[in-house]
């Protein structure tokens, strides 16, 4: 009705601007009568709504039946959307705040939905500042609600709150919301990931590092600063082993699939003025874990283990996206993998993660893409890894990597089997030499060494 009134008012104004000769008197009268009728109808509707508020809503929003409470709050949310000029007042929206405390999760969910839609209205900060100040502490508690639907929608609502009023949520409360990225509940985690991504984006330079270059003069990717902040956050969170959860939570962030940027930050030395992009060793370890988790999830199209229940049945579109992701990861990581292995050779667990990347790459690219040199470098590094002190996770990863490289039918199978044979020969020689070395020692030493082997 408001749209129709505005349209009729414009038509009347256009008619009134015409000259007396061009103006149609009967049309002018018709438009005036139509506009007057609409004004009366709107006044009548407003009167009816006012009656409903005073005679029904105020009496029933705390009804003993949760269905009636939900209906009342839902309608209040609709009124706020339809007529914000009238209902965006403290005397009305306070009921939304009070309903956030309802004991029934269905009512809380309806209320959070209504409040979230309210925060999407333009210029809401002018009307809802007092509401936010008063009810924000409980909104933050709802992010930890026992009902997953309520918790998810509460975090999404807080995303809109932070967008409208960036400074209203304290740093301490933001940190608590950030940690929800590691939640076992996927929807809560991804809602928190949206909150984290929005906050990180707001801290990025407006222009971006367009002129930034590494020590050897290579231009930096535009999302280097954002990805560095994500890596730093993951390292400071001290939740090792849950990097896959963070990757899954930040599904909204394209930088998590920017594998070229990961490699750039890990391999390239910072240039002049790039001190903020330098990674500490602990951050490099986390960056590798994030990279591997990102490649795995993007290629497999499945949620991480422990967060998603049963595996998804992939559609034709999913299969095509998997293929494209595998090709993109292969092009980026095949040339870089030997350099990364060399860099982290002293860290067995990190090397094990890097070797597992072979499970999700298209190894035919070594032949099709004429990457023979990269294959030689990889086999050389695998041989170097085998010389390292024994480490269970590392040797498991080595066996998986060699098995993957020697899959029957691969164009590189013969080449890799030859290299594997040489490695096993050297390993057998190493075993025999060690056995001879301890054979002359006391029996208890011999038994201990044999058990280790």
Predicted regions and their residues:
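Short secondary-structure transition/capping segments
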Residues: 115, 395-398
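Short, highly charged low-complexity linear segments
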Residues: 132, 170-180, 214-217, 398, ...
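Residue-level detector of well-ordered alpha-helical segments, enriched
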Residues: 68, 283-286, 394
């Amino acid at each position: 009705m408001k749209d129709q009134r505005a349209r009729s008012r414009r038509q009347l104004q256009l008619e009134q601007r015409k000259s007396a000769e061009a103006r149609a008197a009967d049309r002018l009268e018709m438009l005036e009568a139509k506009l007057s009728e609409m004004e009366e109808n709107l006044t009548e509707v407003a009167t009816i709504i006012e009656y409903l508020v005073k005679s029904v809503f105020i009496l029933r929003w705390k009804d003993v039946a949760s269905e009636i409470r939900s209906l009342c709050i839902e309608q209040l949310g609709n009124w706020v959307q339809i007529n914000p000029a009238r209902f965006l007042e403290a005397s009305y929206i306070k009921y939304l705040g009070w309903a956030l405390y309802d004991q029934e999760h269905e009512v809380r969910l309806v209320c959070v939905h209504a409040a979230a839609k309210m925060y999407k209205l333009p210029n809401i900060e002018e009307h809802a500042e007092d509401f936010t100040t008063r009810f924000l502490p409980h909104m933050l508690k709802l992010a930890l609600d026992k009902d997953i639907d309520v918790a998810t929608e509460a975090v999404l609502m807080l995303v809109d709150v932070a967008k409208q009023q960036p400074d209203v949520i304290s740093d301490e409360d933001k940190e608590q919301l950030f940690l929800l990225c590691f939640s076992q509940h996927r929807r809560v985690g991804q809602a928190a990931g949206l909150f984290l991504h929005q906050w990180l984006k707001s801290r990025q330079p407006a222009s971006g590092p367009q002129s930034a270059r590494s020590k050897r003069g290579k231009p930096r990717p535009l999302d280097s600063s954002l990805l560095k902040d994500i890596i730093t956050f993951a390292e400071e969170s001290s939740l090792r082993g849950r990097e896959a959860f963070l990757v899954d939570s930040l599904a909204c962030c394209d930088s998590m699939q920017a594998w070229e940027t990961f490699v750039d930050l890990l391999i390239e030395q910072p240039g002049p003025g790039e001190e903020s992009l330098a990674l500490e060793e602990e951050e490099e370890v986390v960056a590798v874990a994030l990279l591997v988790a990102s490649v795995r999830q993007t290629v497999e199209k499945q949620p991480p283990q422990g967060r998603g229940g049963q595996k998804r049945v992939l559609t034709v579109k999913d299969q095509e996206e998997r293929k494209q992701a595998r090709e993109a990861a292969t092009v980026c990581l095949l040339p870089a993998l030997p350099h990364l292995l060399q860099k982290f050779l002293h860290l067995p667990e990190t090397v094990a993660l890097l070797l597992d990347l072979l499970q999700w790459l298209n190894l035919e690219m070594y032949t099709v893409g004429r990457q023979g040199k990269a294959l030689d470098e990889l086999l050389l590094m695998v041989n170097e890894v085998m010389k390292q002190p024994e480490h269970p996770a590392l040797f498991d990863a080595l066996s998986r990597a060699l098995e993957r490289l020697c899959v029957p039918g691969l164009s590189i199978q013969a080449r890799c089997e030859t290299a594997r044979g040489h490695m096993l020969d050297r390993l057998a020689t190493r075993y025999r030499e060690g056995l001879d070395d301890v054979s002359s020692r006391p029996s208890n030493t011999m038994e201990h060494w044999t058990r280790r082997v």
